[in-house]
Regions:
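PP2C/PPM-type serine/threonine phosphatase catalytic domain
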Residues: 1-126
């Protein structure tokens, strides 16, 4: 059995200064023995990092949920993780372009883990 928990909260400094929470997470249970979880930390100095972190966490986990199954090899799973980062980056780039913003206003980190049975696959960018 896999149990998960996650929360992204606005800290006291952010509340005091009227700054939105720039951190995001997403957890997707793919099957009884497969879960994908992402954490993205938006760069505090960038105006749209909250949007970028949300897109990154959501898109990466959704991509994994749509493509990972138990019967894949380790190499295939790692390839899907890598692709999920690329897809998330593309979505962030599209968001910036759609809003006529500079891409560097959308900076975020992304950590992604996929647990399948007793095997953990992990990727990080940022």
């Amino acid at each position: 059995m896999i149990y998960t928990y996650g929360v992204s909260l606005q800290g006291t400094y952010h509340i005091k200064n009227g700054i939105v929470c720039q951190d995001s997470h997403c957890i997707k249970k793919i099957a009884n023995n497969i879960v994908a979880a992402a954490v993205a930390d938006g760069l505090g100095s960038e105006i749209h990092s909250d949007i970028a972190s949300s897109i990154a966490a959501q898109i990466a986990t959704e991509y994994c949920a749509d493509h990972i199954t138990e019967d894949l090899t380790d190499t295939q799973i790692l390839g899907i993780l890598h692709s999920s980062f690329q897809i998330a980056q593309e979505q962030i780039e599209q968001e910036a372009k759609r809003n006529n913003d500079e891409l560097d206003q959308y900076d975020t980190t992304l950590s992604l883990a996929v647990l399948i049975n007793n095997s953990l696959f992990y990727g990080h960018s940022g």
